């Protein structure tokens, strides 16, 4: 496994060659390669990478913290915790930012430009053989101007499931995000109301989401 700095002309292929602020994943024990920056078949991010998390990663705490912040404190969809029975069998995915928060980032939450490792979350779960759902998709409020994060999380989620064996990949998408998903090769199946919030049940076009090379771990990742 090697570290990749996509913003430089040269590629750093060792931990020592990667700047400290560029490699929160390396500092957390996660290797980084080119596929982790993928956003689509033809586009990559230059600031964010996307990772399946393992239970021994200290990024797991950031994953749960961001989920709670978005779905409990901000959206009030849940009261104290957004965790449910699916988390016991789901695979957590996190988006990482590389470097300090810049002046182009909305700092309305008062982060004060502090470094934030986990800036986006999503989970995937196989509810039946080869039937996958994505859920709990969210982006840190200070980074929502960066459409790359949501795009990269969706790409990572669907391509991972497609690589592990997937005939259908579904998600319940809040109404305000339906247009964004349609641009990413999803189709709406039906409109739903969940906890008083309008959603669409949507399905990904698997022919667009090239199966990822990452092998399915033998043990579940959530701790």
Give names to the regions the model predicted.
Residues 175-198:
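Conserved active-site alpha-helix within GNAT-family acetyltransferase domains
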Residues 94-96, 201-205:
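Short, well-ordered beta-strand micro-motif
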Residues 161-174:
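Conserved GNAT acetyl-CoA-binding A-motif
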Residues 139, 145-159:
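Conserved acetyl-CoA-binding loop-helix of GNAT-fold acetyltransferases
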Residues 94, 104-109, 114-126, 130-138:
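Conserved beta-strand in the GNAT
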Residues 2-92, 96-102, 117, 213-218, ...:
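Short amphipathic alpha-helix that is part of the acyltransferase structural core
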Residues 87-89, 128-130, 195-199:
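Short acidic/glycine-enriched loop/turn segments that link adjacent beta-strands
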Residues 70, 160, 180:
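Short alpha-helical functional segments enriched in proximate histidine and acidic residues
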